[in-house]
Amino acid sequence: MSINLTIDICIYLLSNARNLCGKHRSKQLHLVCSPNHCWKIRHVSLQRGLHPHKVRCKWTKSETHSCSKHYYSPSNHGLHIGILKLSTSAPKGLTKVSIRMSRIKSTLNSVSKAVFGSQNEMISRLAQFKPSSRILRKVSDSGWLKQESIKQAIRSLKKYSDKSTEKSPVPEGRNHIIDKEDDIGKQSLFHYTGNITTKFGESFYFLSNHINSYFKRAEKMSQDKENSHFQEKSELEGKKVEEGKSSSLDPGILTSQADKPDPKSSAGTMDKATSPSGTPESLPISTKQSIANFLSRPTEGVQALVGGYIGGLVPKLKYDSKSQAEEQEEPAKSEPAGSKDKTVEEKKHLSLQREKIIARVSIDNRTRALVQALRRTADPKLCITRVEELTFHLLEFPEGKGVAVKERLIPCLLRLRQMKDETLQAAVREILALIGYVDPVKGRGIRILTIDGGGTRGVVALQTLRKLVELTQKPVHQLFDYICGVSTGAILAFMLGLFHLPLDECEELYRKLGSDIFSQNVIVGTVKMSWSHAFYDSQTWEKILKERMGSALMIETARNPMCPKVAAVSTIVNRGSTPKAFVFRNYGHFPGSQSHYLGGCQYKMWQAIRASSAAPGYFAEYALGNDLHQDGGLLLNNPSALAMHECKCLWPDAPLECIVSLGTGRYESDVRNNTTYTSLKTKLSNVINSATDTEEVHIMLDGLLPPDTYFRFNPVMCENIPLDESRNEKLDQLQLEGSKYIERNEHKMKKVAKILSQEKTTLQKINDWIKLKTDMYEGLPFFSKL
């Protein structure tokens, strides 16, 4: 293939360039368009161009060269390009070619000068913006600098074009074309200058009209709508600025008014936008970007080009949605604040209910998983771990006991209790007590022991118990199924029922506690009384309790098979307007059997004694969790009725055999006060005595219960001994009066001892065995499911 071109004074002959490039891999060749400009063709790849076998090349500008008739051959590539100087004596063939290509010559000459200039010149010729036009899109600081450089290049080119037009006037036939181009350039992508139109002629005019009609076909139709839209937008922005709110559009939208230059740069652009006469021109807002902006940024792709022309519609739609949202918000603001508060409270209530439901479901699922894991376990050591893990779970979440019972936990535990491993048996007894499963009572019915509060006067109750032990020849914890105490009675209940201490040791310990605690200086006690409302040191009392009882929990005492059910009573003073009784138990209630009294078994033993003995004026009130505890004697100094209720919850089908109520002595004065008035001290004493009265409960129970069921032992003292008495002679006096009272009521004591010594009948033993097997195998043994 051969190409013969006659351009001005030089001709270039390229013989079979495809073969040469493919074989010799030529890198570049130089093409001289004029004696002062040199262009080089750089080989890129063997791609298809206009001709199916033509090599695509890239044209780049190089330095100026002068060429004559010679052969330019790139080194080591073998590409020969013939360059011949033409003259009037040129061959005929070349003259014909020159005549035929005259029109192509003129067209290519104008195209080469207009198109193949520098990048800034090309951009300036394609993007002759009006001084008042602005492109609304986000740019960085470097982008603004680039725009400023482009504007400077435009100004320099304008000056150059003005000078060139003065030197070479435009023909008259082209004047109307230039005027028409100036009018169209205000609203077109291509902005015509005199230099370009003069050189291009009709070809450039046709090309520019085609591009402008393609890219800006709908601009005139939507211009009015866009102007009205952006006018509304500016009004909305003004309102938001007044309200102190900042509005910003989506960063993905190129044509956004939210991103504006700083005041300095905006001031500079306003100065530059003024007309030569000094009057500022109006700045119409254009939502579309011209093709020159995308040519100046070669890294941007087709998506940016398309987005620049359709992006003008997005802000309008976005602002319409915002205006609708604002219209909907206006009636909502007019609603009263009370309804909003109600909705907020309802939402909080619903969220709390949802959280509770989710928590309850998770607790139930965890309980089921632990029970099923225990039922699948056969190894005794692993069973101990499973049982203890389930015990801790139920202590933390008592509401899971019902699910555990439904999952047939009790039969599994009863079968495990038959194993000979003592550790496993102790763990099983603890979790059975926690669930509320109890063994049958020891005697023919329920046997209850209750001890009143009274400080160191509790030695009187010890004298009564000593006589019962002497008559029955059994320790206290074997005589009774349930032991309950208040204040000092709780101390005796724990020592006798939980620690199984002998009576002599209990009396010695009782005297020592009295001397250690109640030996307080009067002056120091008075100061403490005014400061903490406690005459004695509560911290010392807590320290003694921790040393004696340790950190064991109440429920852990159920591991001992000989341990009866034990409870200590305190009074909660911060729940509601009236005090409420609180029961510290070493057992739990079976699911479905609800007690009327508050309480729990997850507390430590020393905490139960500390709360139950917090007598006002003697010891400071004790805070345990969210509750504030005081002495239980403030509400129930005689806990017999409470003990009966608790026993009925534990053994609902068992009869009540015996209730032994032990008092700490009472004092009855024969002195009569004035009948006209009473002193303030007397009034306060009457209130306290009525609150701590034990005889009214005794009278009521004695009249309601069957004969030989309720036995009350409370001796009358010849002297009113205070609660904090620690002198040994006074304590000896109390013991002596207690012994005299027992001697006077020896017949009554023998009756109680006889009832407590009765054994179960054969029929009761058979019933207990059947019940145990039924619970163990979920039915009668011969109808068992296993």
UniProtKB/Swiss-Prot annotation:
Residues 158-180, 225-285, 321-348 are annotated as: Disordered. It is a single-pass membrane protein. The active site is at S487 (nucleophile), D631 (proton acceptor). Residues 225-245 have a biased composition (Basic and acidic residues). The modification N6-succinyllysine is found at K740. A motif (DGA/G) lies at residues 631-633. Residues 449-644 form the PNPLA domain. Pfam families: Patatin. Its main location: endoplasmic reticulum. Expressed in kidney, heart and brain. Calcium-independent and membrane-bound phospholipase, that catalyzes the esterolytic cleavage of fatty acids from glycerophospholipids to yield free fatty acids and lysophospholipids, hence regulating membrane physical properties and the release of lipid second messengers and growth factors. Hydrolyzes phosphatidylethanolamine, phosphatidylcholine and probably phosphatidylinositol with a possible preference for the former. This is Calcium-independent phospholipase A2-gamma. It comes from Oryctolagus cuniculus.
